[in-house]
Amino acid sequence: LKDYIKKKGRLSAKETISISIQMVTGLQAAHNHHIIHRDIKPQNIIISKDGKVKVTDFGIARATTSTQTISTSVMGSVHYTSPEQARGGVVDEKSDIYSAGISMYEMVTGHVPFDGESTVTVAIKHLQEEIISPIVEVPDTPKSLEKIILKCTQKSPMYRYQNCEELLLDLKRALVDPQGGFISNGPKVNNVDETVVMDTQEIARVQNRDYDGEDYDDPDESYDDEEYDDDSYDRRNRREDG
């Protein structure tokens, strides 16, 4: 997907939604087995010649119980990481949804919302800065897609989509009702000029995170990684059980 975005510059709204539906469906399959990917990004989304989308590279994925979440020092790619990952906090399905929203933003605009000279700079932007609406960059972005992206990328997990099923419903509706106002508003989206004040201890935690700095590798390198589906999950469980 990363190469495809580079080739086209940016994707149409319809193509973005169609790819996103397949991407989120793959995530939903993982989440249904209590697997959190933790490194969703276009480099890990493979588009086959027949247009099928696969979520790949579960290298830092973690299994949870139905009531358990993850708190760990392992970090995915900083340009797509959620605020809670950046600060080393609790990670669950909503963290993957944030990363999916960043990937949608890149499909629509042709670039990631936050960039900087270092991984720490980018991580702090995920924590402090509000994402500028894709409509500012691409005025013909449908209202429904804009709202979906902004809801996915809320700073607080409680105001994002709570699961992939909710997100899929809105993505499918956006295909047939691009300008619809059906997306529930969560909290008021902060003005883009607002910043969140971080104390020195929180900044220090971000600076000590273990980021994957290779954000723009050739996605062909992921072709041999394990794709996620129910069969591969069952095979992996049998291997682990001996």
Task: Name every feature range the model reports, one short phrase each.
Residues 19-20:
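Activation segment signature within eukaryotic-like protein kinase domains
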Residues 96:
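Conserved catalytic-loop aspartate of Hanks-type protein kinases
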Residues 2-11:
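AlphaC helix of the protein kinase catalytic domain
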